[in-house]
Swiss-Prot record:
It holds the Pfam family RRM_1. It comes from Nicotiana sylvestris (Wood tobacco). One of its GO terms (molecular function) is mRNA binding. This is 29 kDa ribonucleoprotein B, chloroplastic. Gene3D superfamilies: 3.30.70.330. GO terms for biological process: chloroplast rRNA processing; mRNA processing. Residues 164-202 are annotated as: Disordered. GO terms for cellular component: chloroplast thylakoid membrane; ribonucleoprotein complex. Could be involved in splicing and/or processing of chloroplast RNA's.
Length: 291
């Protein structure tokens, strides 16, 4: 079979056997792509399972202790179930050590986890630092977003964003909550507070700078930290692709005054951030996206 050009995916399905139980036993089944393009990693010690902030989860324990030496023929193969996009959460800024089992164990604290996908690079087999978690109900989705957006794992604050990828909106932000002003893949000309405050608040777009040539690993927090050196950052966001969840390599920072904007352009244009020389300029209504 010809090799696929997309990244390898790791799916973890959880199917409750006894719905009436408060803590039902679960069966685990894996949906797998051809073995050449799939990286299944279930380690009880070398993954992010043990590095997540301390909590006890019978589910994650069962995942960790499931047979590591189990033959491929013994793994149940199932078709990927279809779930409403409203039940899916995007989880970004994951440490590379966090796998599907660790992610499922964490999100189980917010409700019943239906499916977990951690996205892996096909060529390197390394986690790309983001994934998706599907819950059973919208209430559980909202609870998970509120509980885990900004939750720290291995020193990294993960991003959790709920809901399907909506049509483009003028008032949106990648980190937005469920107050109606959010975008799954990141806002274009978003008017929301930094960190995705629920409901959003207006910011003055005239005091905004465009930041290009960003490293894929730079997130909202890193952007805010750098630009805070030049003034009061009202809003800072990296723009993400709605389909892949990957950074598009640029973002926007909004200051409280035009002087801070000018200072940021003068001081930070060409500065090295995470190995790349960033471009900083005054933001236009429709910024030219040069990469």
């Amino acid at each position: 079979m010809a090799s696929s050009s997309v990244s390898s995916l790791q799916f973890l399905f959880v199917t409750p056997q006894t719905p009436s139980s408060l803590k039902p036993n679960s069966t685990l089944s894996f949906f797998s792509l051809p073995s050449s393009s799939l990286n299944l990693s279930l380690s009880s010690s070398s993954t992010g399972l043990c590095s997540i902030k301390p909590f006890e989860s019978s589910f994650s324990t069962r995942v960790a202790l499931s047979g590591f030496d189990q033959l491929e023929d013994d793994v149940e193969v199932a078709e990927q179930p279809r779930f409403s996009e409203d039940l899916k959460l995007f989880v970004g800024n994951l440490p590379f050590s966090v796998d599907s089992a660790a992610l499922a164990g964490l999100f189980e604290r917010a409700g019943n986890v239906e499916m977990v996908e951690v996205i892996y690079d096909k060529l390197t087999g390394r986690s790309r630092g983001f994934g998706f978690v599907t819950m059973s109900t919208k209430e559980e989705v909202e609870a998970a977003e509120q509980q885990f957006n900004g939750y720290e794992i291995d020193g990294r604050a993960i991003r959790v964003n709920a809901g399907p990828a909506p049509a483009k909106r003028e008032n949106s932000s990648f980190g937005g909550g469920r107050g109606g002003n959010s975008s799954y893949g990141g806002g274009r000309d978003g008017n929301s507070s930094f960190g995705g405050a629920r409901g959003g608040r207006s910011v003055d777009s005239s005091n905004r700078v465009y930041v290009g040539n960003l490293s894929w690993g730079v997130d909202d927090l890193a952007l805010k930290e750098l630009f805070s050196e030049q003034g009061n950052v009202v809003d800072a966001k990296v723009v993400y692709d709605r389909d892949s969840g990957r950074s598009r390599g640029f973002g926007f920072v909004t200051y409280s005054s035009s002087k801070e904007v000018n200072d940021a352009i003068d001081s930070l244009n060409g500065v090295d951030l995470d190995g790349r020389s960033i471009r900083v300029s005054a933001a236009e209504e429709r910024p030219r996206r040069q990469f």
